[in-house]
């Protein structure tokens, strides 16, 4: 087993979106988390958002970039001594949160920041799209040494194949096999 990094949740919160926009909901949650936990938002150097549905089914710009701008994190002029914030989306349906956590764990040592922000949520794509859902928004502040250690990305490359992703959740070894078979439609 080689590589891998441990990350933990320092703080998290979720709420129904209701009539608020996803952006306003996540901005409010993030600000509350930072205030409750005495976290300087400027110490967030990585932002990853995951979700399936976006307004008008748009892919770019990334939702995380909109949230970064709304929170005014790392938006100052860039210079040799300025703090930078890397933000992007991971859209992979139900696997999105899992992949977002793996991405954060892998990028922490490279980016060298104190905290990462993981957000998740969906919004109604447009007024024409049927929307029977009551979506929630979720935000978590992740650190390399949070009290709730949730992900260890060490991987046994001896067992690797094209259909296996291994990770360790809650200190239990967990393997997921992903296969795809063609479906014939008439």
Question: Where are the language model's segments positioned?
Answer:
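Cys-dependent condensing catalytic cores that perform Claisen condensation/acyl-transfer
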Residues: 1-17, 28, 103-112, 117-125, ...
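Conserved "HGTGT" condensation-loop signature of ketosynthase/thiolase-family condensing enzymes
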Residues: 1-52, 59, 65-76, 145-186
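Beta-strand segments within the central parallel beta-sheet cores of soluble alpha/beta enzyme folds
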Residues: 43-51, 79-88, 114-121, 151
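Conserved catalytic cysteine-centered active-site region
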Residues: 54-114
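Short, well-ordered, mixed-charge alpha-helical segments that flank or form enzyme active sites
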Residues: 55-57, 124-128
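Conserved, well-structured core segments that form the ligand-binding/active-site neighborhood
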Residues: 119-123, 142, 176-177
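Internal gly/pro-rich beta-alpha loop/helix module
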Residues: 131-133
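Short beta-strand scaffold segments in enzyme catalytic cores
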Residues: 137-143
